[in-house]
């Protein structure tokens, strides 16, 4: 609990939520439905019913593009829990890397483009390269990597 009282942790948590809200807004602007219309937490639940994409297909396509999400049921779900109509997206890992709202817009664009090209594995490879480039700008353990000259 001591960490939660730290000013840096409070700032981090505010950024996690800000990132989730911004990511949500970008996806809504592109015509995606967010369960509850948005988010006030670190997670958002994307309902893909209006896009005729299953949660399982979205999870697999995004994974091949280097974006980790989880398939998830949505309210009034009609599909099997092994297939689902939604995906769950969280922002803590992105925020931990130092990403902010500007980067959430880029992540949203890559999610949108991947789902629009869900049947195109070559497109997923291109997106995976873009994801790697973005992550390289925000390395985990940057201090350790620079100290030891890791690439």
Regions found by a protein language model. Give the residues of each.
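Hydrophobic alpha-helix feature that most strongly marks membrane-spanning transmembrane helices
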Residues: 2, 21, 28, 49, ...
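Conserved PLP-dependent catalytic core of the aminotransferase class-I/II
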Residues: 2-35, 40-41, 56-65
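Short beta-alpha connecting loops at secondary-structure transitions
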Residues: 4-12, 43, 90-96, 116
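Short, charged low-complexity intrinsically disordered segments located at boundaries
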Residues: 3-6, 24-30, 52-57, 90-92, ...
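Composition- and surface-driven signal marking solvent-exposed, interaction-prone regions
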Residues: 12, 40, 58-60, 73-74, ...
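Conserved PLP-binding catalytic core of the aspartate aminotransferase-like
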Residues: 33-87, 91-98, 149
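PLP-dependent enzyme catalytic core of the Aspartate aminotransferase-like
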Residues: 18, 81-151
